[in-house]
Amino acid sequence: MASSSSSSGSSSPASKRSSRKRQTPPMPELPSFLLAFPHAPPLGFLRPKLNSLVVQVKRQGITAEPVFNLYSRFSVHTLSHNLVLDNVSSESNKTSAVFCKRHVGSSQVVIKIYSPHIKDYLPWTISCTKNEWVFDMLASFSIENSLRIKWVAPDKAKLNETWKCYLHIQDVKKSYFLASLTSRSLQFEGGSVGLSNRIITHRELEMVILSTSLCVQLSLLNLLPNYFPKP
């Protein structure tokens, strides 16, 4: 009996180690962010400003330094100011989202996502109603790469103030809950979404969620009343 119990005890840790090795490692969790609006514009006239302010997005609970900046830049192609959201990492690894008009005089706003991973930008068109904001990436070259991000308004009857974000993958007709947005912070929940075979990577998905949430947030704060579409 003693030898039997000792042999089973010695084999158990090994079996646990082998089972752990066979498990697929989870995708990294996307962080929670805070939006910070500085009281004074940055020094120097060369730095672009958004309504005299640069909106800084800070990683919650980790560092007080901004990890994303949102600013405006004049576009000679559309004769309007584009909004640019980019991370503050090195230029070689920079991921950016540009909110821009499709062409001169257009009322349609497009979000273009740039990153080192993609050769061309990923365009997202915007539409909205009173209850939701919808962002469509319609990839004409492949239906597999057609995605929809939908932000659903909170249920005021339940005294809820949280917006919910969902990713709809068109070709497989699946929907994933991705993030929640309050007046103070954005919390990602997208760790279970598998995008390894698609054009958009996990890092770019982070930028898409962040940029779409900023559309909702800035509109709710009435900071850009004439820029984003009206319900």
Swiss-Prot record:
Domain of life the protein comes from: Eukaryota
Bias-annotated ranges (Low complexity): 1-16
Protein name: Uncharacterized protein C584.16c
Organism field: Schizosaccharomyces pombe (strain 972 / ATCC 24843) (Fission yeast)
Residue numbers spanned by region Disordered: 1-26
